[in-house]
């Protein structure tokens, strides 16, 4: 099993010999793209109610400043630049557009502010990406589904948030897994924003317009 997502760029890190000239306690910005599903809410809760107090107790953290862009790339870019201008020492992002933020990441890097993507990835050589292999995860889901229906049948693929690295990689993996079974036909794709209520509504709409 390849542990690296084939869509994630790999190269020598720009931070290999980098050292910050800033001393703790640090102020960290979290430029969140979305908080409308259970996973994102859980990640926010853990960051603010578990990690933040522990870091503060250790004397490493002053505060975490949170922004929300609600899946608007232009707004997230603006918020990243504003966080840099406000004097944060580092920025966290999550499940972002893989290319749209690259100039904002460079803006931060040029001013001594590292940007960390803690799940998903960007294509900027100036960000630090920490991510699982979403393509492999999707492939495993696709092959499992194909085997569950006996290698034959019509499949509706419900993906996450199109245009965002983790979602796109996972969706590509699902389709790759399903494609290994000639008897499987992908009859449609819908997006559910990784939110169960949206998934139910979108599935019902699709079924209503595709009877039989």
Spell out what each predicted region is.
Residues 1-212:
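A residue-level marker of the well-folded mature domains of exported/periplasmic proteins
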């Amino acid at each position: 099993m390849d542990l690296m997502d084939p869509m994630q760029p790999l190269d020598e890190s720009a931070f290999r010999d980098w050292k910050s000239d800033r001393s703790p306690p640090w102020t960290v910005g979290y430029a969140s793209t979305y908080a409308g599903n259970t996973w994102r809410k859980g990640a926010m809760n853990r960051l603010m109610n578990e990690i933040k107090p522990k870091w503060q107790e250790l004397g490493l953290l002053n505060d975490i400043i949170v922004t929300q862009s609600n899946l608007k790339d232009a707004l997230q870019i603006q918020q990243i630049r504003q966080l840099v201008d406000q004097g944060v020492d580092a920025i966290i992002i999550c499940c972002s557009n893989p290319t749209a933020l690259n100039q904002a990441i460079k803006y931060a890097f040029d001013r001594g502010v590292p940007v960390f993507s803690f799940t998903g990835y960007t294509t900027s050589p100036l960000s630090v990406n920490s991510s699982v292999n979403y393509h492999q995860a999707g492939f495993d889901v696709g092959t499992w589904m194909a085997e569950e229906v006996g290698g034959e049948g019509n499949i509706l693929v419900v993906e996450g948030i199109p245009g965002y690295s983790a979602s796109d990689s996972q969706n590509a993996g699902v389709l790759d897994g399903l494609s290994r079974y000639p008897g499987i036909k992908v009859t449609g794709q819908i997006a559910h924003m990784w939110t169960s209520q949206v998934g139910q509504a979108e599935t019902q709409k699709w079924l209503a317009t595709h009877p039989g």
